[in-house]
Amino acid sequence: MNNNSRNNENRSTINRNKRQLQQAKEKNENIHIPRYIRNQPWYYKDTPKEQEGKKPGNDDTSTAEGGEKSDYLVHHRQKAKGGALDIDNNSEPKIGMGIKDEFKLIRPQKMSVRDSHSLSFCRNCGEAGHKEKDCMEKPRKMQKLVPDLNSQKNNGTVLVRATDDDWDSRKDRWYGYSGKEYNELISKWERDKRNKIKGKDKSQTDETLWDTDEEIELMKLELYKDSVGSLKKDDADNSQLYRTSTRLREDKAAYLNDINSTESNYDPKSRLYKTETLGAVDEKSKMFRRHLTGEGLKLNELNQFARSHAKEMGIRDEIEDKEKVQHVLVANPTKYEYLKKKREQEETKQPKIVSIGDLEARKVDGTKQSEEQRNHLKDLYG
């Protein structure tokens, strides 16, 4: 029985596969496309009118009444419909359709004075007969009351964003943006810039400028030109006047000193001139080494102390020893910091000077115990 049931199942699967292959050949379909790609989703809106009566989620695709075979992958075809963008080729730039940021005015229904107490228009949709908390419409974020200029009583009208925009327009990051405030800010900046240029000191023109030789001569004479152009004495009283900064021609860059010398003392990478105060040349590597400062100097001193302490303890570099790890600075930084600090304190600590009189025996000072106190202590402690 089991073998017969298996054979029947195999025959049914073979027949079903043959049937599907035959249908795919007739409809010119690719049988290797999975079902979740071939089937149209339930929310797909571009189904042809001939297929409206049929559920789009079926595997089989119907043919049109005229005999044409419909595209079973129509929901994967990108077509420009209803003003949508054609994004088949994303490598080419395309101009968008723009954002329609429009509003529509919703005026409340006219009501009598008698009904105005019991009825009020909705601030959300603008209709009368219910309040905003009872409104069944979708809550709108952009709500605004604007005066109605056409009305004599100046009744308010509700300004609501238009809802006929497509999804791309509503989800755009610039949706609802108005550049009016930014334009006003830019115009204010331009006005301030023009006023600043107009109010700038006009005396600073080409006539007040002079060459470098004249500047050096004026500095040697302790004179300088003020904002008007007249010469002033260089003293503390006239220090607030206009004065230009100058640089003497005798000044020259430090790297120019190496032009006629065989050695180059200027380091272009660090832009420093090699001097004895900055560092020295290493004899082994023939490289210029800067003097250590700050934490680098402290680490170097601590490393030297660790090396000397290891030699005192009998540790040698050429001999392999398990205890060598205990005398490495990297493995024991806190230990050597403590030892170095302790040794410095011992060196700076002055020996205490004790006189001979302090070491001599002295007579005991104090109150002598009475016989009664001795007997009492003897009874307590035996």
From Swiss-Prot:
Annotated protein name in UniProt: Pre-mRNA-splicing factor SLU7
Keywords carried by this UniProt record: Glycoprotein, Metal-binding, mRNA processing, mRNA splicing, Nucleus, Phosphoprotein, Spliceosome, Zinc, Zinc-finger
Species whose genome carries this gene: Saccharomyces cerevisiae (strain ATCC 204508 / S288c)
Span of zinc fingers (CCHC-type): 120-137
Subcellular location: Nucleus
Modified residues (Phosphoserine): 120
An annotated Gene Ontology molecular function: zinc ion binding
Location of Phosphothreonine modifications: 212
